[in-house]
Amino acid sequence: ANRDETVFENPDKLIVTRENARRHLSFGYGIHRCVGARLAELQLKILLEEMHERRMRVNVTGEVQRVRANFVHGFRKLGVTLSKF
């Protein structure tokens, strides 16, 4: 659903300013919503704020290996480095 072209234009592109950005299903939906979703969202918020304050960015290094499965769209291997800008 997160890559449904009828819901998200350019679904494979990260566009955080989308009007419907919060309509993703990353943490499930309804009674199947992940119990740790709010904690994960808070942790990501703090991480991004701290990286912004320290003027840091994440750089992808090397080849990206994706996990292909019915219920998971993630990464098997994703090498990164942190740098300042």
Regions found by a protein language model. Give the residues of each.
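A residue-level signal for conserved active-site and pocket-lining positions in enzyme catalytic cores
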Residues: 14, 44, 80
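Catalytic-pocket segment enriched in acidic/His residues
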Residues: 34, 38
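Cytochrome P450 heme-binding "Cys pocket" and the immediately downstream C-terminal segment
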Residues: 39-67
